[in-house]
Amino acid sequence: MSTAALITLVRSGGNQVRRRVLLSSRLLQDDRRVTPTCHSSTSEPRCSRFDPDGSGSPATWDNFGIWDNRIDEPILLPPSIKYGKPIPKISLENVGCASQIGKRKENEDRFDFAQLTDEVLYFAVYDGHGGPAAADFCHTHMEKCIMDLLPKEKNLETLLTLAFLEIDKAFSSHARLSADATLLTSGTTATVALLRDGIELVVASVGDSRAILCRKGKPMKLTIDHTPERKDEKERIKKCGGFVAWNSLGQPHVNGRLAMTRSIGDLDLKTSGVIAEPETKRIKLHHADDSFLVLTTDGINFMVNSQEICDFVNQCHDPNEAAHAVTEQAIQYGTEDNSTAVVVPFGAWGKYKNSEINFSFSRSFASSGRWA
């Protein structure tokens, strides 16, 4: 699409576009802001639907050949001109989040999202173990660490790698100076996503919390779990003098203690090959095809597969409802762990709502105890 056409579409457009902008501004004035705070699953879901023609059906921009979207967002004009296609502004008000304690005594999961600059958004989940100290440390300091690095490093993959290593080093200093000896065995996963100009998505992770992009209704995995089951990870552990032992459930653990091979914290295992260097992935969003990004902790991942997550989210009216649906489904399937989800809507939100839900009703009923 030409620059002139983009500017015409955004600044003037037809009556339908102007009416949509008016409706959007009214909605944003009335809508309650979603902040990075856990909401109970009984809270009323918010729905961002539009019917400017009075038909009662969701409004779309199909007449302009752009995308089918049930969440109305303004266009980012400079990036749209730069990339030659409309790029919607992702508003934090529309990000959904939910966290459930499960059957644990304490919720050690943490999540966060923020606008770091005019161009960069930040989303993260942290799944603590050995207490919440490491997850709390990341929740408190990671955002500022990334902000401090942004003016110095333009490559977001390099930036996130530096941020993870700096946070791990800072937590190590904090733990060693603390009188609390339990901090030496406290650690956390970290899955962090940065979105620049509404189109460049970069994800970095250590541990087994995941990031999934829903493209054309199908999951695109942006992270790979760091476990001793991976040959490359296991080899590093052994080269560093560590070992892998299996518990009574047949699950491999580093030195018989930790189920992951990369983390922030876990200072007692640093000499055994447990590292804080993340694996990163960069992807260019296609807003006509990409519905959402979802970040999840292992309380969800080990019970609900990636396609099921996409299907459950696609059936929901808005991201906040979707985040609750995913965490509650994990509980129904029998998870005992904390479960957390952050759902970030993109241009094709709602486009694949009618996709087939591929999950087993017998599994659902059995897990919920209805057939016990």
UniProtKB/Swiss-Prot annotation:
Cellular compartments per GO CC: mitochondrial matrix; mitochondrion
Ranges for region Critical for association with the BCKDH complex: 46-61
Residue numbers binding Mn(2+) 1: D127, G128
Reaction catalysis annotation: O-phospho-L-seryl-[3-methyl-2-oxobutanoate dehydrogenase] + H2O = L-seryl-[3-methyl-2-oxobutanoate dehydrogenase] + phosphate; O-phospho-L-seryl-[protein] + H2O = L-seryl-[protein] + phosphate
Coiled-coil regions listed in the entry: none
Residues with PTM Phosphoserine: S248
Outcome following mutation: R104A: Decreases the affinity toward BCKDHA by 61-fold. Decreases the catalytic efficiency toward BCKDHA down to 2%
Annotated function: Serine/threonine-protein phosphatase component of macronutrients metabolism. Forms a functional kinase and phosphatase pair with BCKDK, serving as a metabolic regulatory node that coordinates branched-chain amino acids (BCAAs) with glucose and lipid metabolism via two distinct phosphoprotein targets: mitochondrial BCKDHA subunit of the branched-chain alpha-ketoacid dehydrogenase (BCKDH) complex and cytosolic ACLY, a lipogenic enzyme of Krebs cycle.
Similarity remark: Belongs to the PP2C family.
Name the UniProt record assigns to this protein: Protein phosphatase Mn(2+)-dependent 1K
Organism in which the protein naturally occurs: Homo sapiens (Human)
